[in-house]
């Protein structure tokens, strides 16, 4: 957004596997619907996810609520306009649009149709399904086959995956703004906080401004949306500067080559 403030303007954004009552992705885009100039926000939930087992106000207050389907079917939520007349489009305007025919798996026909409708896909997919495995299409390939823009979380190890690396090599996708040396921290539920504080601080969690935040060290962003960090100049040292101030290198060159200059090779 800092690089291109209009990146989401007039766009339909799909958040698959993101229940709006529990997903910070949905909350974030709902809160910034007007600022980003979104056309439509679509969120789906997966029936077998932990958050899906809890009823949301959006679902309970809807005439479409069905207790049996709640436990077995994925759900569809949409946000398009100021439904409550508050003068602003926000999370209170999210509409429960009904149950999916299946469990909400991203590979299903109905979620794939939502993918095709969307301009941009953003989510935190199951890391175990990031790439194709055992003949089942992976999440990244599912997006790329539709030629969609995306921002998704994944494990750093996916960089070396035979299905992922070629896309990085061809500059078709790239890593997000976060440096690989930086950890990610997430807001977590109260129950999860209690579980975390039994672990060692720094390994599983970190207290930031008095709040217990879950830590994820091995995650990074994958995207094909341009961002400013890709255009920042690399600060590279010069050979002359390195020879002048690198005492260890000077000592090695003098010992092995009898002079303090870089050796030249003809190969």
Where do the language-model regions lie?
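Class I S-adenosyl-L-methionine-dependent methyltransferase catalytic core
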Residues: 1-267
């Amino acid at each position: 957004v800092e690089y291109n403030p209009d990146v989401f303007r007039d766009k339909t954004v799909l958040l698959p596997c993101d229940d709006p009552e529990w997903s910070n992705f949905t909350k974030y885009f709902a809160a910034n619907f007007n600022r980003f100039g979104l056309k439509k926000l679509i969120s789906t939930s997966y029936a077998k996810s932990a958050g899906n087992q809890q009823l949301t106000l959006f679902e309970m207050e809807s005439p479409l609520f069905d207790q049996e389907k709640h436990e077995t079917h994925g759900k569809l939520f949409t946000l398009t306009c100021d439904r409550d007349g508050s003068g602003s489009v926000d999370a209170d305007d999210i509409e429960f649009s009904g149950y999916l025919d299946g469990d909400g798996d991203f590979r299903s026909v109905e979620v794939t149709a939502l993918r095709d409708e969307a301009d941009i896909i953003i989510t935190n997919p199951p890391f175990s399904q990031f790439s194709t495995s055992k003949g089942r299409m992976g999440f990244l390939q599912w997006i790329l086959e539709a030629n969609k823009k995306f921002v998704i979380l994944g494990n750093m190890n996916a960089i070396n995956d035979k299905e992922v690396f070629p896309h990085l090599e061809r500059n078709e996708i790239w890593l997000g703004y976060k440096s690989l040396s930086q950890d990610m921290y997430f807001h977590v539920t109260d129950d999860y906080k209690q579980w975390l504080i039994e672990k060692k601080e720094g390994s599983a969690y970190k207290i930031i401004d008095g709040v217990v935040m879950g830590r994820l060290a091995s995650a990074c962003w994958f995207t094909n949306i341009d961002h400013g960090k890709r255009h920042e100049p690399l600060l590279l040292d010069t050979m002359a500067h390195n020879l002048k101030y690198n005492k260890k290198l000077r000592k090695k060159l003098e010992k092995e080559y009898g002079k303090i200059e870089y050796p030249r090779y003809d190969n």
